A protein has these predicted regions:
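Non-transmembrane "mature" sequence context
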Residues: 1-112
Length: 112
């Protein structure tokens, strides 16, 4: 039985071209757990659900300012405005607002 959070994992994967390892890295879940979410066998909860919701918000914004196929590249790149941290790692640490601020700059400029 699918839940909203499990459906969100599939949505993020589809629109943002993120892999199972990317979703696992950002949410702090293991890859087996993420695959279970994608098969609607389990549902994210607690911190995993929070990280997934944050990732979803960011991915939905990212696809408006860059090609969707570039999203996974950008999420794995060291970003100078994040002190050369990678967005996936910043999200995993619960600091998605840092990524959101960088993204706001991209939104203001129109594109990457």
């Amino acid at each position: 039985m699918a839940t909203s959070f499990a459906s969100e994992a599939a949505h993020i994967r589809e629109i943002g071209h993120l892999s199972v390892p990317d979703l696992a890295r950002a949410t702090g879940a293991n890859e087996t757990t993420v695959r279970a979410w994608l098969r609607d066998e389990r549902s994210p909860s607690g911190g995993h659900a929070e990280r997934l919701a944050e990732l979803s918000s960011l991915v939905e914004r990212l696809v408006r300012v860059m090609e969707p196929a570039y999203v996974p590249v950008w999420m794995r790149k060291p970003i100078p405005l994040l002190d050369d941290d990678k967005p996936l790692d910043v999200i995993a640490a619960g600091e998605y607002r840092r990524v959101s601020k960088v993204l706001a700059g991209l939104e203001a400029s129109g594109a990457v």
